[in-house]
Amino acid sequence: MAFRIWRFAAPQVFYPIAGKMIPWFMVVAAVLAALGLYIGFFVAPTDFQQGEAYRIIFIHVPAAWMSMFIYLVMAFWCAVGLVLNTRLSFMMALALAPTGALMTFIALWTGSLWGRPTWGTWWVWDARLTSELILLFLYIGFLSLHAAIDDVRRADKAASLLALVGAVNVPIIYFSVQWWNTLHQGASVSLTRAPSMATTMLAGMLLMALAAWAYSIAASFMRVRSIILERESDADWVRNLSEVKSP
């Protein structure tokens, strides 16, 4: 059983599997995003305090959730790569980073758009906003450090160490509204208490979160396939692929 699972860590085994899964995740992402946006923008009621401006949360909150979740998954693969020295683990971490950076940027950008009518300013050095900005810098730093080192194995290990150290920022982002007095509102969705929003609002937000999750998987699989082809370019199995043969 363990051997059967372990064989999926081989790039030549994972490459075709990822290729088959990408279209499915893209379709799921598109369908869920369409449903989530429809519910969020046309079905969910108007907020009695923020009016229509609050609807940006249907993009902002899922992006913020995914920015943290992707970083934790990236750090997990970095840890697996360092402990087990598996090439695919490092490739997965590298493939996740751009999507994580994109989600973090979207969270910051939509947060600024939301903050302008709510707080009267585009940006404040609030604990949650600042720690989310640090998360973006960590993603950029991970990618930059990896690109700056010519030796791939050394680059993998150095960037992985940075990712593991930066993982401490994720709980800071999540608990910042509890640890400090911040302008940012508390969590609307929690595992320990009932949600403080209408059912249709929650449904739209969860659908958008699942759409972001499915998109992130598809994008990461597309990227890791490119990384595999680049790193395994001298392998016989890559030369035999019809998609990389010269016409």
Where are these regions (language model features)?
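Polytopic transmembrane helical bundles with strong interfacial aromatic enrichment
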Residues: M1-P247
